[in-house]
Amino acid sequence: TGSCTEKEKTRCFALYSEQKQALAETQALKRPAVLAVSGVHNSGKTTLLEKLIPLLRARGLKVGVIKHDGHDFTPDVPGTDSYRLREAGAEGVAVFSGNRYLLTEEFRLNEQDLLALFERHGYDLVLMEGFKESGWPKIEVVRSAISKEPASFEPLAVVGDVPGADFALDEPEVLADWIAAQMPAL
């Protein structure tokens, strides 16, 4: 504020206060740890996540999930009011109650955009289902009935029933402990 004239001091102080507040809010944001849970189709990714999420939450973590869908999915149920409004041409439709909301929009975005949303809401860990060809740190689910080896390049760990797997499918508690210990590096 040293370059402000006497007349501008009030405006400069307000601007300085806004900048200071914005900086404090930015510094308060912490990036969530990110871990992809990869594997071929029907390898058990969703089943593993269903087991891991409550175990990670029991360890005090706020956990979010980004699920990749290679197909264009329908986010709403035909016949509902929100579906009808979307069909009528609304570019965005939000449905909310006291405890949750769903915002449906159609535009191109990527996982970075979604991670920014999770970051703003203070998530500790974001698990990304799929993303086997991404550069994100990942664990891979490999089941002998489906595939014999990892489909992704250098997973941090293999979860499955194949020789050399780092974690067994039926020991999600051990895997949850390992993930919690790895979080600072993710």
List the predicted regions and their residue ranges.
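C-terminal accessory "lid"/substrate-recognition subdomains
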Residues: 19, 78, 92, 103, ...
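Phosphate-binding/switch loop-helix module in NTP-utilizing enzymes
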Residues: 104-133
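N-terminal phosphate/diphosphate-binding loop that engages ATP/GTP or pyrophosphate donors
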Residues: 53-106
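Phosphate/Mg2+-binding loops and adjacent switch elements
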Residues: 125-185
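Short, hinge-like loop/turn segments at secondary-structure boundaries
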Residues: 80-84, 111-112, 144-146
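Fold-independent oxyanion-binding glycine-rich loops
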Residues: 40, 68-69, 97-98, 129-131, ...
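Extreme N-terminal, non-catalytic leader segments
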Residues: 4-6, 11-35
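Walker A (P-loop) phosphate-binding motif
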Residues: 25-71
